[in-house]
Amino acid sequence: MAHHHRSTFKAKKPFKSKHASKSSLKEKYKNEVEPHRSGPKNIVHTSTKADRRNTAKQIQLNKRTEVAMNNRIFGGKNGAPKVITIVPLCNNVDSWNVLTNLLRSIDPEASLPKFDKDSISYSTTIDRFKQNLLFLLPKREFYSLIDACKVSDYVIFVLSAVQEVDEFGELIVRTTQGQGISSVLSMVHDLSEVDSLKTRNEVKKSLQSFMNFFFSDQERVFAADVSQDALNVMRALCTSHPRGIHWRDSRSYLLSQEISYSNGNLLVRGIVRGKGLDPNRLIHIQGFGDFAINRIYEAPQGIQNSRGISMDEDTNLTGGLVELCSPTQEQDSLESLGPIIDDMDTDMDSEVGKEASRGVRLDDFYYFDDEEEPVAVAKRVPKGTSTYQATWIPDEDEESDQYSDVEDTEVIIEDQDNQEISNHVAEEKIDSDEEETIDDAKSEMFVDLSEEEEVRQYEEYRKKQKELQEELEFPDEVELQPNELARERFKKYRGLRSLYTSQWDADEYDPNEPREWRQLFKFENYRNLKNKFLKQPFIGEAKPGKAVYVELRNVPIEIFEYYNKPWNLLVLYSLLQYENKLTVSQFTAMQHSEYEEPIESKEELLLQIGPRRFMVRPLYSDPTASGASNNLQKYHRYLPPKQAVIASVISPIVFGNVPIIMFKKSSDNSLRLAATGSYVNCDTNSVIAKRAVLTGHPFKVHKKLVTIRYMFFNPEDVIWFKPIQLFTKQGRTGYIKEPLGTHGYFKATFNGKITVQDTVAMSLYKRMYPLPCELFKVTDIDS
């Protein structure tokens, strides 16, 4: 007989609903609300041929409208001229000869006017293409060339057929590429001097390969001495539309055609470009600073270049001019710092110093002996506030807008401590834990040095390279001398349970903070403010393409004397609201591949950001880690090679992803491209934490109990740093248990067994404050 499995004894199965009645289902779900169903998901909408044709037609119409709006300022007889800069990349290139060939290609029989080669500009009207052109031919000087490229609609790079691009020419190309450049054309000079046709083609291919390395859209190199090629260049200049520079076109700027000066007022004539010119915004003049607009007047349209000299105090510059617009009560102030806070009780040095002298700090608490209770860190409160009232004062909310799109890195090292910041130069006091200060690295000079000087520079270079190598191999490690007290050397340091989760109050009272730190401007949401200023439409009379007179007030006579020379180019850049206010600016920085010397934190560099230049000493740090719940950034002593980090300085705020370039000045006043990047954020709540790692040697090991030596050299230091967590290079963690003897030996317990080959370490952290920038003035170019 076949085996038969018995049935289950459970006859009633209430969880089965196969035969449930309607009434039972209603009873079961009577208190539930049926979810809203918007319809079936994943509906595939099939578009017809007419729909696709209509969509393409709308896209095409939008593009045509956009191009027409952008070309409007260049159209017509009185349209704004297109600005074209001719950049010679070799010593034997004559820019005026190239300009002559371009103009003769339009009409070979026409007589050209005599050029004023002392002038930087030449204006002309091309009747054949009904276009006004303004050629800029700056001298082969660094600042003149890059400033002209910055304001140009087209840049023509001219190479030589018989000479290679020198180091200076390559620096110009890399700088213009880094700062942002509009449309680019490439030409070759003296191609007729090459004998055979085959060699000419090889030269053109080689030069095109060179230009394609920097600008991939360069499909051809035109010959300047070939009439047809020159005509093609002129046709491209007159009929095409320039690509533009995003950061420049999002602001208003004006290229001067005429300047006059009287009684502290500077009158500049030019055509408004970019966005409309708002009289309530400040004007930046490169190399001199920010100035306020007094009034804006109408000017006749058309090309006009002259230098008006009017220095009599009784002369009225604006006599007979029609006022277009003037500033209101909402005009931006020239003050770059906030008001001094004098209602806060800052007499806390003794209290904080008393707490700091009783124990080490772990996160936001000072840890004393076991019989004492930990005391919270002191806060800044208004004068007359009692202890009970102070507990009701909430801490400020931390900024929620954190950037997390930058790589997280690991290398950090010791550096000098900041004490005070003056309005121009920060006063630095070197901690006892600092190594000997290293002079700035010298660039290679093209003159023979003395044997002693060569030896000195070589030793200096090797020393800096050795420090960088040690930094990469043993990050943050410091050594204590046997006669040195750790609690004194690391008095300003604290312990952190985790660099990614431990909180650090950025607004706590710190006796070591700079004097102007509380006057820096803070913004609740930088991203929203940036979008507001960059996307808001312009409402006013000084629209793009309109010729105007701009009157600036309280202008020094030195500006007129400098820019009244025909070879100097004056450009007025309008700043967005708040862009003259000082704050903690943060931007990405990556060392340039051609710059091989180590770049140290606080090393003086020339920073160019948009139209402004500053002398800065940035602090390098990792960005706040992605997903981290705090505002900590790990400090770097050196700018890590081939790695993007955050550079922090106290400078005026910038709105938008503006490119930055940093240069290193050498002893012969030449510049080397050191680093590039872009503006990221302004954030005074970010804490740059410098880490110091104390290391010790396992002397005796008994399972998880280890005797450690050479980390401290007296029992008082062991007791002082007892709350700080220990870790090993192999991943174990532990805590100090008790000191042993009088030479700094101590017992420690770990979460696992360690070996005598392992290294025991302890991390301590100190806050670093960014240093202020200095405006790079025109007078500093030759100094």
From Swiss-Prot:
One of its GO terms (cellular component) is nucleus. Pfam families: AARP2CN (PF08142), RIBIOP_C (PF04950), Tsr1_G-like (PF22298). Keywords: Cytoplasm, Nucleus, Ribosome biogenesis. It comes from the Eukaryota. Residues 24-37 have a biased composition (Basic and acidic residues). Residues 1-21 have a biased composition (Basic residues). Residues 80-243 form the Bms1-type G domain. The keyword Cytoplasm applies. The keyword Cytoplasm applies. It is found in: Cytoplasm; Nucleus, Nucleolus. PROSITE patterns: G_BMS1. SMART domains: AARP2CN (SM00785), DUF663 (SM01362). Residues 1-56 are annotated as: Disordered. One of its GO terms (biological process) is endonucleolytic cleavage of tricistronic rRNA transcript (SSU-rRNA, 5.8S rRNA, LSU-rRNA). Its main location: cytoplasm. Required for 40S ribosomal subunit synthesis. Required for normal export of the pre-40S particles from the nucleus to the cytoplasm. PANTHER family: PRE-RRNA-PROCESSING PROTEIN TSR1 HOMOLOG (PTHR12858:SF1), RIBOSOME BIOGENESIS PROTEIN (PTHR12858). Belongs to the TRAFAC class translation factor GTPase superfamily. Bms1-like GTPase family. TSR1 subfamily. This is Ribosome biogenesis protein tsr1. The gene is tsr1.
